[in-house]
Amino acid sequence: MSESRIDFRKAEFLISAPDIAHLNEYLPGDVGVEIAFAGRSNAGKSSALNLLTEQKIARTSKTPGRTQLINVFKLDKHRRLVDLPGYGFAQVPLALKKKWQQALGEYLLKRECLSGVVVLMDIRHPLKDLDMQMIEWAVESDIPVLALLTKADKLGQSARMKMVNEVRKKLSNFDDAVKVEAFSSLKGIGKGKVLGILDQWCKPEWLQEQLTAESIEAQIESGK
């Protein structure tokens, strides 16, 4: 069965949870496909989600670190987007930072339905230590990564492409496991490419086979 392109504009808020234990209380098991958005607290995750879904689905704030919870958005009954707590912001109290890091680690290590991770980084300051830790963890776990260089409108086209190429070179040892794209929530730079990658991640082979089986079963039932 050939499935049409995923419509990310249909995303709707599902739940917020302080940690993986509470997340499991609300979700119908560790099933389906989830795509996680992770990044430093000032990387622009909420703005990116709002642009990609064409709605104000995630709260934005001028105060980095506002997203303290795991926020889950439903695309359809099989697919979800997950906005993870921001990490690494210096002004966040240490105790709160440790709590966020624990929730982040629990989700990444225990969530079996994770199909891809978008790691957002300011294009002017990419590949900080925590960004690299996130990328390395995902690759080691056979989870594809999109390194998204945000705020690309802050650089001219030449400088932007130079930075993209530099980051691609630094991540080249990961081969095809990591893709790198420039992105701007303000100007819409890279939106089409990102949606294309997310669409692929939303359609793993096992889910396509399941949807085909469900379609055939529904046709049989309707013919009775």
UniProtKB/Swiss-Prot annotation:
Function: Necessary for normal cell division and for the maintenance of normal septation.
Annotated NCBIfam families: GTPase_YsxC
GO cellular component: cytosol
Family statement drawn from the similarity comment of this UniProt entry: Belongs to the TRAFAC class TrmE-Era-EngA-EngB-Septin-like GTPase superfamily. EngB GTPase family.
Claim: Nucleotide-binding is one of the keywords in the record: yes
GO process terms (BP): division septum assembly
Gene Ontology MF: a single term: metal ion binding
Key words, A-Z: Cell cycle, Cell division, GTP-binding, Magnesium, Metal-binding, Nucleotide-binding, Septation
Binding site for GTP: 39-46, 65-69, 83-86, 150-153, 183-185
One Pfam family cited in the UniProt record for this chain: MMR_HSR1
Organism whose genome encodes this protein: Shewanella piezotolerans (strain WP3 / JCM 13877)
Cofactor: Mg(2+)
Protein name per the record: Probable GTP-binding protein EngB
HAMAP family referenced in this protein's UniProt entry, alphabetically: GTPase_EngB
EngB-type G domain: residues covered: 31-204
InterPro entries associated with the record: G_ENGB_dom, GTP-bd, GTP-bd_ribosome_bio_YsxC, P-loop_NTPase
Signal peptide bounds: none
Binding-site residues for Mg(2+), renumbered to this chain: 46, 67
UniProt-listed Gene3D superfamilies: P-loop containing nucleotide triphosphate hydrolases
The keyword GTP-binding belongs to this UniProt entry's keyword annotation: yes
Superkingdom as given in the UniProt entry: Bacteria
